[in-house]
């Protein structure tokens, strides 16, 4: 069984599959569809974070699922989805083979569609935008974090899973999809998007000068895909050669992605120290450490907002708790659960919540987020205004760094 770590507006960790437990009946007596249902049940039984399985008898759930007529893959998929729905966890979900392949492409650095990172609100159940991908049709149309997607092509999203919603927004380049959007304090409105190829180069970098003429390296990281760590390391190296004396790392509207990518990026800024703790259902802790030489020890400010989620929060929390960076902006999204992706025997996939994470100071940020050292709220700005005088959070970060550079210069 193959395993793979991935992101989806959400944060995932490598996990290995061990023993499986017993069948409800001898393996030879099971159809392929029943074997698939049992395969999913065993993975959840072994790995799921909540050992009460949402306060239900998980063995009974298996028995009920296998008693249903499962005459084709679609029937098996339906039984699996119903079984997982009983956990009341939007992050533990089944992906049919097409959805699984699409998710693998998403984390590889290539994507086509409207460019939305989405999540189900665990309290309201509504389908929400985590963030639009930079330069995507969704961003160009003005979609924002926390926007509610009420309908897709006229169909209510009320009972859709994440993957069903994502599938309805996918389609050929140049095709149209209509969304009904709800935004707090505003009337519902329809937005028409034209699907396109989404560029997933995760790093934007350039050297800037503070009002006092101090060279500041500006880095914007848009997501943690397979290319993120390598691209960021290259950008830091280039800025160091150009004489950067301090850095701004912009994680605003970064929905996360691959956990390992977040850890690798944290190691680029830390010589030592804990990056993150993971806690499984037995309460056992694992941890990831920085062990090596940081790419730079220059002063660092991280920009965050409510669209900063998952792996972005791991990075921000690690550098804040280790005293390596100051955070400026708004409280982050609050996604502190870890999923692992399992490839199933028929080519479909299963994402399972297997653990939660804590920052180095043992903060559990799930549904709470990370509070910045300096809170600066601001109205949404255009992509062209990011990092300009119109960007109050960026200007506040420059001010913090300028003071740090003055202190360093007077020692």
Q: Over which residues does each language-model region extend?
A:
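Extended, small/polar residue-biased N-terminal targeting/export presequences
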Residues: 52-126, 176-177, 183-205, 406-409
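Terminal peptide-recognition signature
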Residues: 40, 79, 83, 116, ...
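Terminal targeting/pro-maturation regions of precursor/exported proteins
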Residues: 2-93
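Sec-exported extracytoplasmic/periplasmic mature domains
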Residues: 41-49, 63-70, 79-92, 151-154, ...
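Conserved functional hotspot residues or short segments at active or partner-binding sites
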Residues: 365, 384-388, 392-411
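PDZ/PDZ-like domain segments forming the peptide/carboxylate-binding groove
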Residues: 109-151, 155-158, 226, 355
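Cleft-lining beta-strand/loop regions that shape enzyme active-site pockets
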Residues: 139, 153-156, 163-335, 339-340
């Amino acid at each position: 069984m193959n395993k793979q770590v991935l992101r989806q507006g959400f944060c995932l960790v490598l996990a290995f599959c061990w023993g499986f437990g017993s069948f409800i009946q001898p393996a030879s007596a099971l159809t392929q569809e029943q074997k698939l249902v049992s395969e999913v049940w065993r993975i959840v039984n072994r790995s799921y974070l909540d050992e009460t399985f949402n306060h239900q008898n998980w063995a009974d759930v298996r028995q009920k699922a296998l008693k249903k007529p499962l005459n084709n893959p679609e029937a098996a998929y339906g039984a699996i989805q119903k079984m997982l729905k009983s956990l009341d966890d939007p992050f533990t979900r089944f992906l049919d083979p097409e959805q699984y392949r699409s998710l693998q492409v998403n984390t590889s650095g290539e994507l086509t569609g409207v460019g939305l990172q989405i999540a189900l609100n665990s309290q309201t159940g509504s389908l929400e935008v985590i963030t639009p991908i930079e330069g995507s049709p969704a961003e160009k149309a003005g979609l924002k974090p926390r926007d509610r997607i009420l309908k897709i092509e006229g169909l209510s999203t009320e009972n859709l899973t994440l993957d069903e919603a994502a599938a309805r927004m996918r389609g050929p380049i140049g095709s149209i999809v209509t969304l009904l959007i709800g935004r707090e304090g505003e009337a519902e409105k329809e937005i028409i998007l034209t699907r396109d190829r989404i560029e997933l180069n995760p790093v934007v970098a350039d050297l800037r000068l503070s009002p006092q003429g101090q060279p500041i390296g500006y880095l914007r990281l848009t997501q943690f895909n397979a290319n993120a760590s390598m691209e960021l390391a290259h950008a830091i190296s280039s800025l160091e050669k150009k004489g950067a004396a301090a850095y701004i790392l912009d994680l605003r509207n970064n929905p996360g992605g691959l956990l390992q990518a977040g850890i690798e990026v944290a190691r680029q800024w830390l010589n030592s120290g804990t990056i993150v703790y993971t806690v499984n259902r037995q309460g056992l802790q694992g941890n990831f450490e920085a062990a090596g030489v940081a790419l730079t020890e220059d002063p660092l400010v991280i920009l965050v907002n409510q669209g900063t989620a998952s792996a972005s929060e791991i990075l921000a929390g690690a550098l804040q708790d280790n005293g390596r960076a100051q955070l400026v902006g708004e409280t982050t999204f609050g996604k502190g659960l870890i999923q692992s992706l399992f490839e199933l025997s028929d080519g479909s996939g299963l994402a399972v919540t297997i653990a939660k994470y804590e920052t180095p100071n043992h903060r559990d940020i799930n549904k709470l987020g990370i509070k910045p050292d300096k809170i600066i709220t601001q109205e949404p700005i255009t992509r062209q205004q990011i990092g300009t005088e119109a960007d109050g959070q960026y200007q506040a970060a420059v001010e913090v760094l300028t003071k740090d550079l003055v202190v360093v210069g007077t020692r």
